Amino acid sequence: QNVICHAPYIINLANRKDEQKWHFSIDFLKGELKRCDLLGIKSLVLHPGSAVGLPKEEALQNIKDGLNEVLKDNFNCLILLETMAGKGTECGTNLEEIKYLVDNTSYPVGVCLDTCHLNDSGIDMSKFDDYLNIFDEKIGLDKIKCIHINDSKNVIGSHKDRHENIGYGTIGFENILNIIYNERLKDVPKILETPYVGETLEDKKRIYPPYLFEIKMIRAKKFDENLFNHIHEYYK
C-alpha cells in the first residue's frame, strides 16, 4: 500500500510561454496517473516546476491551472508536490508557495518533504519540529504523505540540491534520525534517495547502492563510520 511513484522531470507545469510544451506536460502527467491507477499505486510525487524567466507568481498560477486541468479527469492516484531546494527558478521552495498550490488547486493534492531540499532551501534541520509546527499551522500535517530521506552535500540555504549519504552530509545522522522517528510522522512512508557509492561515478560497473547498509544504520540508530568500506566489501 506504500508504493509511491515519481513523475519524470520532463514535466514542467510552471512555464506556459510555449502552449504546446505546457499541454505536453499536462498530457504526460495524465498518462503517468493513468498508469498509476492501472497498477493500483496511490501516490505520485511531482516536482512543481521551474519558472524559466516568468515571474514566480505567474509560474505558480500556471502550476495551479495545470494541476486543475490534469485532475479534472478524476484519477484515484494522489499527486504529491515535492518541496524543492530553490535551484535555478524552481517553484515550491518555501511553505508559502506550497500552501498556495495546496489551497488553490481545486482537487486534493498532498506534499512530499525532501530533507536535502529543505536544508538547501534554508530550513535548519536541527529544528525540524519547529518547521513541522509552522507546516501544521499553514498547511496541515495531514497533507504530508511521503518523505524523501537524504543528507546534503551543501550548507543550509545553498539552493544547490546535491544529495549525500546518511550521516555524511551537513544535516547529520542524529538530525535525520529525529526526522525518521518523529512521532508525528510515524505513519508517513519514508524513501531513501541517497547517491550510489563508488570509486568513480564514471565507472558505472563499480558504483553500488547504499540502501541495505543505510537502513541497517537507521534501524540500529548508530552511525557507521565505515559505511563505504562495508558497501565495497559486500558488492566485491
Protein language model features and the residues they cover:
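Active-site acidic/histidine proton-transfer and metal-coordination neighborhood
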Residues: 12-110
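Short acidic/polar active-site loop segments enriched in Thr and Asp
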Residues: 42, 145, 186
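A short, acidic, amphipathic alpha-helical segment used as a generic capping/interface helix at domain edges
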Residues: 130-137, 168-184
